[in-house]
Amino acid sequence: MPSPDLISWPGRSPEANQAYGISDPLRITYLLVMEDERLDRMTAFQGFGRGWWLLIWALYQLAELPAQVLEPTWPLDSLLRQRIGGASGLSWMPIMASALDSLMLDEVGFCVVMFTGTEPAARRAAAWAARQPRPVLHVSSIATPRTMTPDAMNLIVLRDHCRAVYQAHGGEISPDRRARALEAIEAWTPRQPVSIDLDELGHNCTTPNHMVLRRAGRSLGEGIPHWSSIDEDAYTAAILASATAVMDVRKAVGTSNVNRLFVPLPKIVLTEPALFRFAYGRGDSRGTSLAPATVMMIRRMQQQKGLAHLIEPKQLSMLEHDGEWQGAVAERQTETAVQTAGVGLMAAQSCAAVVRLRPEVNHVFPRLSEFARNIRAVNPHARAKSPQLLQRLQDALARAVGPERIDFVRRYGGPVRIVSDAPLELLPIDGLPLALRYDTSRINATPGNLMMGELAGRVPITVDYRDLLHVLVVSSFNEDDQLRDFMREALDQLEEVRPGEFTIDFRRVTTVDEFVEVVNGSTAPIMIFDGHGVQDDGRGLGGLRIGGQTVDIWRLRDRMRCPPIVILSACDTHGLDAPSHSTVGNSFLAVGASTVLATVLPVGGREGALFIYRALLHLAGFVPAAIEVRMRLISWTEVMAGVLRLSLAKDVLDHLTRRGVLPDESDRAIFRGVLRSVLDADSDWFETMMGSGHRTGTDIRSHDCHPKRWPSLPLRWP
């Protein structure tokens, strides 16, 4: 839907105004322009474009640049409160040179800064800038007469550029905004940083928090470049010391009523780089053209579990006599450095603490595979082991993360964002999975390019909850499929319970062309897919079953316009044990979805329909109540977290009622108590339910109703 405050740009059609209207011409837009790259040229282990390494300096610079022209004049604490609350985020994005060529400046922003790191990208970016109606500041590591070098770029240079833009072209915006912009620009001065007692250890495990602290106006203590240790505990201490320093800033700043206007962003980011899933395979070193030292170093990367690096004398001797291995190690170091800078930039925009994990979290996948195979077993006696296998998986996760990091999360609470491939949603926090304890969202670490696009984020969109009651439901079940009618029946029941409240567009499709036509023809902000999902079988293809064929959603990117919210009621759309990153959930993100709710395990047709029924009922009833109780906006992550918690509570209480554990009608009273706890955003909501049985004379805690009995948790992205 168009912005309520569009700016009509001279020379642009009304259609373009609707599509590209900029509601805030005081915002500064930053573009990282890269050369076009083929997929087969991405980095080997995590899938980054090779242009990222040549722009890593730009990520660090962005962390200290203002989001808009008024920002440098605001009191620091007031600015930080806005950032913590979800406002004043940077508008930045990576873009290929060919895509830039197809854009007009007005489609990008009013005041624009470009960064380039290669000669071809710099040349094309400069040519594009020369065609635009307003000047564009071009910062490049490639020295040309029309570019600014990274070393010369600073707040004063940016100020002078912004002043020139608003003086010469301020007539294109409203007079009051032009006056405000020019008045603020004249008052720009570098802030005097606040010193804190934290040494600047030069290591990628602490760098993200250093970026956060510098953007928060803090200066660090003694710099120790290229810091390292042979003691794993030293890394843990350094990570948590830097993360605690960020939390101290948040505590000192506090919140104000302005935070009610914005959604709360994650306060903790859990991150760990990963290899492509297939890259963990040992393979057969016999017959390989790689030198033994190179094979040895790749194996070390595959098997690494801690941050401390120890190498045996024999291995060291191998490295001394062969230099080929350096290329593989350098590539992996580059990937890690890019993720480090990207995560740091994302966290810096909301003053979030970054907790780097240990590579051991990526080694729980054998446990995942064992658990997932058991869930899929046809024999019900085999599936009886599922709770035990889930417990083993959670224990392995807890060991990999470590008690110190878990204590940090417990101490400060959520919201939490995961930037990792590991299933950290299942990490036990006081007996409850992380995703049920705290509001949790995720960005996958592979492929790297997709991760960086998600880290760039988007300008938040605020809507009335009633706008979300228009839903497209696409069903692809065959006519003879026994699961075909469960969703339709659930939606009919929803209409009986909440008559006239929803606009449900239910469409059945039998071909890929029909699917694309239905999705493109809908204006609903939410799409629910009801059908069969197919997990990657090891050949790099996970998809949806439509018309008897498996459809790779990624291949529809040039044909399909994806709605912002996608909910997948299909099996294994981001499988726990998927052998590659090519999942349905990832694919919908890659083709344009803002958020995806995917499944990590098989789901029954009846259970999937029940979940959708509850989720939509939740939108209509819980969301307005939560807004009233919390007296602020709520995020989509909070909405979905509420669905998961209340669904689990309802399942537990129904289970106990069927067993005769709870007296008649007492389950409703207990559920109302849980509902109040969830409405209050209480992370102890599960304990509230477990203890509330005392009012009915029942000790719920003495019965087997732990969440491990309900292991099929959906997975969600921000």
Question: Which ranges hold each PLM region?
Answer:
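Domain-scale, conserved, charged regions that form catalytic cores
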Residues: 2-514, 518-522, 536-537, 700-718
